């Protein structure tokens, strides 16, 4: 119509405003470029592809805060959970921002978190060679990464949050240690409390000093629980791992690294994470996108028999006996008086000495959590028969077992010290062959 000019500008503005309100995720981004910054005041976040994870600032109020003031952190959480927010990573867990002025930006090929006075409180501190510009990305699996502009390998990063776990292990993360270079050890450390993300009392760490590797749950520096060694399928001391049908477990043990990792198979609607809780339990927590309520799939320590060295040397724990601690056949309580008073931590001693020769025999114990492996040696080339012969010839040998239970069993684990921290299961576990004096094998 002549004389009427359609106001397309206002129409488009209104249209995009409506879209932004109704579908805010359409405009979300997972990248941070060198000319951008995330600030507390802007309330902007990075959202991973698939809308599962979100990175941004969050605050907590703790009793330890001066005057109960808020503390601010840069972290990653599940965007898909309703109600209580579930955090999976915190950058500055032990160096909080003490007011609502904080900035995350890229500076000199590193991510830097600045406080109100532009003082760095956290940084990736990248020291290698980078092709500028670099970008930061929150990936679909929850990994926050820094990469340079010339990298064509999508799995190669200058820095990644997966190398610096907090209290949570996500699918595709690794827990363990690199054996080359000066890369950090990857462990889980609990929050100090449910509302304080600073480092707590409990940690979950892979022991890599011996021939076999197993995880320990520590309270400060004291061992609370041991998983048992990896047996080719699962950790020997966690029989329930065989029931984790939707989890693919893997253990890497080579010249470059020793680490555990897992992935969720088949059903991508399932979210699973391992969490070292502030109360001292390693938890496997799972939920689905359709039912966001979190379920505790598994938690340890589960019972008294899970506690580290609860029965002492040459004794095993069994939840189906009373008392729960039992001396191995051919052994007697080291201190009978304390044993009768249910103080069994001293363990047991041999009732008959070994002859160190063919006069000794072996007691087969089924469905066992294998003893602590710090005093064990490994020979991957031989089987159970050769392992027995080797143990017979070694007067220091106290027991042996298969290293790997796959395909009927292979490899040899041989203990040369006290057998400690054992338990018997109703199902699962492994066969353990304990060297005993011939007299101990005679039926009573």
Curated annotation (Swiss-Prot):
Keywords annotated in UniProt: Disulfide bond, Glycoprotein, Self-incompatibility, Signal
Bulb-type lectin domain location: 31-159
Organs and tissues of expression: Stigma.
Domain PAN: 356-437
Pfam families tied to this protein: B_lectin, PAN_2, S_locus_glycop
Segment forming the signal sequence: 1-28
Keyword Cell inner membrane attributed: no
Gene3D superfamilies, alphabetized: Bulb-type lectin domain (2.90.10.10), Hepatocyte Growth Factor (3.50.4.10)
CDD domains per the UniProt record, alphabetical: B_lectin, PAN_AP_plant
Disulfide pairings: 387-412, 395-397
Highest taxon of source: Eukaryota
PROSITE patterns to which the protein is assigned, alphabetical: BULB_LECTIN, PAN
Signal among keywords: yes
InterPro entries the record matches: Bulb-type_lectin_dom (IPR001480), Bulb-type_lectin_dom_sf (IPR036426), Pan_app (IPR003609), S_locus_glycoprot_dom (IPR000858), SLSG/EP1 (IPR035446)
Any one GO BP annotation for this protein: rejection of self pollen
Glycosylated position list: 43, 125, 243, 396
Biological role: Involved in sporophytic self-incompatibility system (the inability of flowering plants to achieve self-fertilization).
Protein's recorded name: S-locus-specific glycoprotein
Organism of derivation: Brassica oleracea var. alboglabra
Gene from which the chain derives: SLSG
